[in-house]
Amino acid sequence: MNRLKEKYVKEITPALVSKFEYKSVMQVPKIEKIVINMGVGDAVQNAKAIDTAVEELTFIAGQKPVVTRAKKSIAGFRLREGMPIGAKVTLRGERMYDFLDKLISVSLPRVRDFRGISKKSFDGRGNYTLGIKEQLIFPEIDYDKVTKVRGMDIVIVTTANTDEEARELLTQVGMPFQK
């Protein structure tokens, strides 16, 4: 069993039950999935950009991403419907816990001038979104092979009903929130 999953079962669940006074263990919020999305705006002019983004996301997530395509044509962006404009990957189960563990313990500390992540990025329904400005913070990415620095969005979807419950869950897991 993964280190984070074990911690969740043995330590976090009892702590959350006592703090929020749940009647059942099944009411305790848990992390459902993690979605990593990388928008590739320059894929409109450069078709190879989408391939490198897919390759980098595969290294980061350990799973092959899906290429996202434009829903509408936008003349101002020279964009046609159906053109590839990004890549996303959804992690669940064991891979999700592995990725979260790596994100918290290895990748986030590598961010320049890191003082913790914002407490304001909850959506009101217990989900947390984290924006990362460069893919170089992940140890799987080889610095010399990077052609362009790209950012990504990481969405942590939980079963929590309120932001307060989700914040407590993520704090217990070890997310480094700002003081």
From Swiss-Prot:
Keyword set includes tRNA processing: no
An individual GO BP term: translation
Keywords: Ribonucleoprotein, Ribosomal protein, RNA-binding, rRNA-binding, tRNA-binding
Keyword Ribosomal protein: yes
Residue stretches in coiled coil: none
Entries under InterPro entries matching the protein: Ribosomal_uL5, Ribosomal_uL5_bac-type, Ribosomal_uL5_C, Ribosomal_uL5_CS, Ribosomal_uL5_dom_sf, Ribosomal_uL5_N
One Gene Ontology CC term in the entry: ribonucleoprotein complex
Entry's Gene Ontology molecular function annotations: rRNA binding; structural constituent of ribosome; tRNA binding
Family: Belongs to the universal ribosomal protein uL5 family.
PANTHER family, per the entry: 60S RIBOSOMAL PROTEIN L11-RELATED (PTHR11994)
Annotated function: This is one of the proteins that bind and probably mediate the attachment of the 5S RNA into the large ribosomal subunit, where it forms part of the central protuberance. In the 70S ribosome it contacts protein S13 of the 30S subunit (bridge B1b), connecting the 2 subunits; this bridge is implicated in subunit movement. Contacts the P site tRNA; the 5S rRNA and some of its associated proteins might help stabilize positioning of ribosome-bound tRNAs.
Record text on subunit structure and interactions: Part of the 50S ribosomal subunit; part of the 5S rRNA/L5/L18/L25 subcomplex. Contacts the 5S rRNA and the P site tRNA. Forms a bridge to the 30S subunit in the 70S ribosome.
UniProt name for this protein: Large ribosomal subunit protein uL5
Native organism: Bacillus pumilus (strain SAFR-032)
